[in-house]
Amino acid sequence: MTNDAPPLAASSATFYAVKGKNADLDLWYRPRAGQRDSTKFLEFRIGGNSLDRRPDGSAIADGDSVRITVTVKDPAHLVVEFQPSGLKFSSKDPARLRMFFTEVSDDIDHNGRVDSDDDNVKQQLSIWRQEQPSLPWFKVASAVVKDAKRVDADLAGFTGYALAY
């Protein structure tokens, strides 16, 4: 989706989420040359009651922690992997993923001009999930926030995710 984005400040990050406490992680691009501010690549938020089941199916009790790693597998195509694979979130308090398309060219369909077709493509952007690298991608219910240049989705569990149309 993007060829001219600045590099990411970090392509991977790890933190501990504790059931009963809110947790979040942000990944950022590096600032462009001559600029002080950078732009956000993604936000990941876990509510205090989001953690539900470990990958082995066992319940996560209040106060238990889970080590979470987010790795950008392909920054040009906005592909991200979340570990531990198989972690499940509560349906009443799902985790929230926001992926930003701030660094994506305004000519999103790459036809050489910025026009209404690009706006239509932006409205069709969605977060997609892939259970394993060899399996197909499936669309996740998502909301485009065009003015903020981002797509939001609630996550039921961990796997690979990408922003696409």
Region locations from a protein language model:
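Short, solvent-exposed loop/turn segments in extracellular or other extracytoplasmic domains
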Residues: 144-148
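Proteolytic processing hotspots in large secreted/extracellular or virion-associated proteins
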Residues: 2-32, 62-132
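Eukaryotic short linear interaction motifs
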Residues: 106, 135-136, 161
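Surface-exposed loop/edge segments in extracytoplasmic proteins
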Residues: 80, 133-142
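Beta-strand secondary-structure signal
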Residues: 43, 96-98, 152
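Proline-anchored loop/turn motifs at beta-strand termini and strand-loop-strand connectors
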Residues: 28-61, 100-102
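C-terminal beta-strand-rich structural cap/linker in extracellular carbohydrate-active enzymes
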Residues: 150-165
